[in-house]
């Protein structure tokens, strides 16, 4: 319901009709500013279109505007200690295991990697951004090991305790995963093509449109195959469902994070717009695999499935 695809598609057409779209940019700073500005203009234009359409479109647009928030999740609060943040990401890890989300993510990523491994006798290299306590990176490495697939997995986060926790788990499980301290939208200058796949899951909404565009642009420079972003699907159902599921663990701040996150999920057309600005191309898809939105940006010339 909160996808507003009819009004959103018309709003995108209106923006494109203004010319010089997608816009050019010369630096990551300019990309960030430009993307934030255009996404803001897109939402304003969508509101105008919704008013013209009237009825259900306008009501849904108004509801979307009421629900949207720029509040910061507790786990991103600079006043929170790293130990308290770790408690929250471990709660998220437990929830992902209970909901069997990691197997879904791993299946998606392995299908992409198996395309690359066909005919190539080398390790496939994966970098996960904002990996938290490392659940996905560990699950991916474990499944690759089980299938005897030649995959090298690097997890990363900006919080030192997350990195330490990930490396401890990797050592305990004897998995070939290395966790590094990295800023997801200010990556070091890895050599071109250092990775085959760059991934970020359940964190897209933690970043502004401009920061997401930077991540995609960096991936285009350093990744051979694709950037994959996985997050919750923007909908009324998940706005209530995510905090409800989070509340089961009886951690008030985690339940609050669930509510804030669900209100911040990007719509498919917003993700589509951000990817186009970042790459200047249409070599990407955004699909719904309920309850997920999956953005896949290809860098190898192949059209995403």
Outline where the language-model segments fall:
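C-terminal alpha-helical "lid/dimerization" subdomain adjacent to the S-adenosyl-L-methionine
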Residues: 230-279, 286
């Amino acid at each position: 319901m909160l996808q507003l695809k009819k009004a959103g598609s018309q709003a995108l057409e209106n923006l494109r009709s203004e010319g010089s779209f997608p816009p050019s940019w010369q630096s990551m700073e300019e990309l960030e500013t430009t993307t934030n500005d255009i996404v803001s203009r897109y939402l304003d234009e969508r509101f105008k279109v919704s008013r013209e359409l009237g009825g259900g479109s306008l009501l849904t647009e108004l509801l979307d505007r009421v629900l949207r928030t720029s509040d910061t999740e507790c786990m991103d609060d600079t006043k929170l200690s790293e130990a308290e943040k770790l408690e929250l990401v471990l709660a998220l890890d437990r929830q992902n295991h209970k909901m069997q989300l990691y197997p879904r993510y791993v299946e998606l990523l392995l299908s992409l990697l198996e395309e690359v491994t066909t005919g190539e006798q080398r390790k496939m290299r994966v970098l996960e951004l904002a990996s938290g306590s490392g659940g996905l990176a560990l699950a991916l490495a474990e499944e690759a090991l089980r299938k005897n697939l030649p995959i090298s997995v690097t997890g990363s986060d900006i919080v030192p305790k997350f990195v330490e926790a990930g490396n401890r788990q990797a050592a305990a499980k004897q998995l070939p995963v290395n966790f590094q301290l990295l800023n997801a939208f200010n990556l070091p200058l890895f050599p071109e093509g250092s990775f085959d796949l760059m991934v970020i899951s359940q964190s897209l909404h933690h970043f502004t449109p401009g920061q997401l565009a930077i991540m995609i642009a960096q991936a285009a420079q350093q990744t051979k195959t694709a950037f994959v972003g996985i997050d919750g699907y923007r909908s009324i159902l998940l706005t209530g469902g995510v905090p409800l599921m989070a509340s089961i663990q009886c951690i008030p701040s985690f339940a609050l994070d669930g509510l804030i996150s669900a209100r911040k999920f990007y719509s498919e057309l917003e993700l589509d717009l951000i990817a186009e600005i970042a790459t200047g191309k249409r070599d990407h898809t955004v699909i719904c695999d309920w309850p997920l939105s999956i953005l896949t940006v290809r860098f190898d010339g192949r059209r995403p499935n």
